[in-house]
Amino acid sequence: MLDPITSSKALERMVTKHGEKGLLRKYYRFRPARFYGGIATADAVGCNLNCAFCWVKEPRLKPWKYGEFYSPGEVASKLEEIARRGRFSKVRVSGAEPTIGREHLVELINVIDKDLLFILETNGMLIGYDESYAREFVGKNVYVRVALKGASSEEFALLTNAKPEFYDYQIKALENLEKYGISYRPALMTFSKNIQGLKERLEKVSPGLSEEIEIEELMLFPHVKKELEKKNIL
Ligand code: SF4
């Protein structure tokens, strides 16, 4: 089973490299997207989990094969241009785990137009592992959406192929964001009918947080259906 922290370190070596314009990271696409009422989106490669329901396949599973390296400034310019054309007020990095390559992400948030809200969609592993990551967002126009993979550590392991104990880092990420006063919200992908245990954990992070869970939409692409059937989830 996967150790997401060790795998993040290996992935970082693969999907980032130092250049004259800072730490470059690999992206395979830049596009407008319909979510959040319209958002400029940069799709990166590589993730530290392997979710059975993940809509991204090849660029996530073969990050060495897909994408080109871009500096934070280049990504910011592309996102600003898409946002300007679509009249969007929000930007995000999707398609992968954006927290891999911390120096790149932090610089991207620093250089992008401050009027654009940066929505950080993350599985929270690295923010839960190291609380100083959450501190990087203090004073920034950032909103963090932590996507919880399952309602328990057992479901997390089944869905992500990672060791069950790493589920705690997802909850810890919420705690760290709460501690530093960062704007955040938990999202949840679950096939469980009972999420009471999770709700109790969230209430300990912040009273009322369990009422703010956003239930994620399952996009049943053929490869997703196949993966879920393989695990007897569907
Ligand atoms: S954490 Fe997100 S990008 Fe990574 S495998 Fe899971 S759904 Fe896909």
Q: Could you say what each language-model-derived stretch is?
A:
Residues I39, W64-G67, E97, A162:
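Pocket-edge positions in alpha/beta enzyme catalytic cores
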Residues A42, Y70, E103:
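Conserved active-site and cofactor/substrate-binding residues in soluble primary-metabolism enzymes
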